[in-house]
Amino acid sequence: MPLALYDTWSRTVRPFTPIRAGQVGMYGCGPTVYDDAHIGNLRTYVFEDLLRRVLERNGYAVRHVVNITDVGHLTSDADEGEDKMEKGSRRTGESAWAIARRYTEAFVRDWHALNLLEPTIWCRATDHIAEQIAFIETLDRAGYVYRTDDGLYFDTSRQDDYGYLARLDRAGLQAGKRVALGGKRSITDFALWKFSPADVQRQMEWDSPWGRGFPGWHIECSAMSAKYLGTLFDIHCGGEDHIAVHHSNEIAQTRAAHGTQLANYWMHGHFLTLDVHTKMSKSSGDFVRLQTLQRRGVDPLAYRYLCLTAHYRSKLHFTWESLDAAQTALNRLRHLYIGWPDGGRVDADFAARFDAEVNEDLNLPRALAVLWDLVRSNLPPATLKATVDSFDMVLGLGLREWRPVAVDVPEHVRALLGERARARAEKDWAQADRIREALSAEGWRVEDTPEGQRLFGMAMGASEPDVPPQ
C-alpha cells in the first residue's frame, strides 16, 4: 500500500506526497547539549530514524538535517531563566564551549550505539549566527519585531492563526496569564535575540545590529532549515513537547519571513514514561541515560527493540522488566538469524505484509508481529534469512553485523549458575532471583530461555560466554 503518515497540522493520517518526485527533505530538532541525552529523548530519534528508513524503503532519497542547539535555549521555554549552556558551565566548571563539545560527542556516541543512520547534515546553532541575524532582519523589515529592555521579540498578534499546530487558545492564555511579561506585549510572544546584560560577561555572545547578545532558541531551526532544505520542505519531526512552543514559533517565523508553514508534514513522537503518568525529563530529575543501560549489561539495541514495540504516537512505559524482555527477544532473534544460511530470496507475501504495516503511519508493533510470524513459519532457512535481512533495513537491529563473542567465565560464576539452575528446578524463585542479582552485581546477565539459562557478559552487545544453557 502507498505510504501514509500522520500530520500534526491536519490531525489526520494522509498519503505522503513529496514536493519533488523521488526526494524528501526532512528536518529533526536535535538536542540541547548541556547534559547527556536520556532514553526518553532518544526514543524520538529512534522514531525519526524509522521514518527515514521507511521513506528509503519506499524508494525516496532522503536529505536528513539534524540541528545541535549549543546556545540560546533558556531554562524556561517562556524565554526566562539562564541559558542552559551557561548553566551547565557553572555546574561543571568547564567553559560553555567545552560543555557543548563534550555533550555533542556523547550524543553522537548514543546515536551510533542505537544504529541510527547518519544525517546528511549535522548543523550547530553557533555555526550559523550570521544566518540567524539575517533571518531576524527579514522579520524586522516585515514589521514582526519589537524591542524590550532585554531583547527583540516576535509579535504573535500579527498572525491570526498563530499556534494552529497546537490548537492554542490564545485568548484563554492571555486572559489566564499569571506571570509578569517583562516587557512582552503578549504571553505568546517569544525572543528572537537576547541582549547580554551590561554587567555580565557571557561566554557565548555575538555582535548584532541591535547590540551584543545571543539568538533565541526558535530562530536557529527556521534559519538552518531554510539554508539546507529551503523555506518549504517535506517533513519536520520532533517530540510532542515541541508542538505548543518551539514548533509553533518556527512556523510563525517562517510564515512571516517567507510565507510558508515551513514543512508539509509535521510529525511528533510521544513521551517515554517512568510510570503511568510521569514523563521522563531532565528538569524533573526522572530520567535514565543510555550509559545506565550499558552499565547494567543491556545492549543499546535492546532499547531500540523496545521502542519498536509501541507506536511512535503512543506512550511507551519504561520498566526494567520490559527492557529485559526486549533484550531476550533480540537475543533469540540474533541466535536464530546467525544459524540460517545465506543465498535465499525474500518471500514476497511476507514482504507485502510488512510493507503494509510500516506504510500505515509506521506501525512498527504490527510489523514486528509480522517478523515473528515469519520466524515461526515453515519457510526454508535461507528464505527466512533473506526476508529478515530485508525487514532489518527498516528495523535497524544490526542483525547482519552481530557476532557472539566468547569470554572466559570464572569457576565461581559457573557454580552460581549451577546453583540457580537447581533453585529453579526446585521452584525456589526467590533464591533464583537472589543469585541473578549476585551475578548482575559481578557483571553477568542471566536470561531464562526454553532451552535453559543463558549467561551473558556485560560487554556492549549480547556477548555470550562459552557456557551451555543449563
From Swiss-Prot:
Keyword tRNA processing listed: no
Spans traversing the lipid bilayer: none
Motif 'HIGH' region in this chain: 31-41
Keyword Ligase attributed: yes
Motif ('KMSKS' region): 279-283
GO cellular component, one term: cytosol
Obligatory cofactor(s): Zn(2+)
Catalytic activity: tRNA(Cys) + L-cysteine + ATP = L-cysteinyl-tRNA(Cys) + AMP + diphosphate
A GO BP annotation: cysteinyl-tRNA aminoacylation
GO molecular function per UniProt: ATP binding; cysteine-tRNA ligase activity; zinc ion binding
Binding site for Zn(2+): C29, C221, H246, E250
Alphabetical UniProt keywords: Aminoacyl-tRNA synthetase, ATP-binding, Cytoplasm, Ligase, Metal-binding, Nucleotide-binding, Protein biosynthesis, Zinc
EC number: 6.1.1.16
Binding site for ATP: K282
Places the protein is found: Cytoplasm
Cofactor note: Binds 1 zinc ion per subunit.
Highest taxon, organism lineage: Bacteria
Principal location listed in the UniProt entry: cytoplasm
Similarity comment: family membership: Belongs to the class-I aminoacyl-tRNA synthetase family.
Subunit text: Monomer.
Matching PANTHER family: CYSTEINE--TRNA LIGASE, CYTOPLASMIC, CYSTEINYL-TRNA SYNTHETASE
Protein name (record): Cysteine--tRNA ligase 1
Species: Burkholderia lata (strain ATCC 17760 / DSM 23089 / LMG 22485 / NCIMB 9086 / R18194 / 383)
Lineage: Bacteria, Pseudomonadati, Pseudomonadota, Betaproteobacteria, Burkholderiales
Gene that this polypeptide is encoded by: cysS1
